[in-house]
């Protein structure tokens, strides 16, 4: 009988097998869904987990060259767009530049009390795609960490380190985990560490697939977001509430992604 690592439940836990699909690597992996909090958990984490993150193929490690070396004029235009969408500096130019499809992160950042000089950490950032996009839009104090990148990256005032979350000592005004929390073992210890890395009255953003979703109910073990064995936990809203309370966070907002049926949770540590 499997015991849930989130709520401790042992009753009515459903066990099932999932295959690795992204790279068609050999192997099947045993998961279970907690009958109480509905968190989906990988039972045995492979000792060679890094082999399932091939640096030349894994999507988050592929960085477009135009994100690293943007033109100064283009950056100035993008900053006008950021002023309009994030910081509500309304003007005609910002309005025109914001017509049409814009990057989703504008909707996340306008919810938190930050500015262009705020210290921002992206945990599990891969090659830094999002950080370089933010740099193009005017943000100046950007840090990322990822244990699976080949080496540190220092380009255009964006600093990305090959390290684990428990190796970080600095504190930050805002921390993001964009589809990385589901890759991390010991989720409660991770949240407690993140709590300690935030400055007072700061915010943590976690974007994850959630188990209490239409896609899990509809596709079952064929749901792409299971992503065995890279996803160690597929949390539910209930499991995230349990963890956040134990770590000392207060949940300020929960947003369900319409396109991917994924969840976004915004926490504050004070």
PLM region spans:
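Short, glycine-/aromatic-enriched active-site segment of Class I SAM-dependent methyltransferases
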Residues: 206-233, 238-243
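Short N-terminal helix/helix-N-cap motif within the alpha/beta-hydrolase-1
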Residues: 185-189, 216
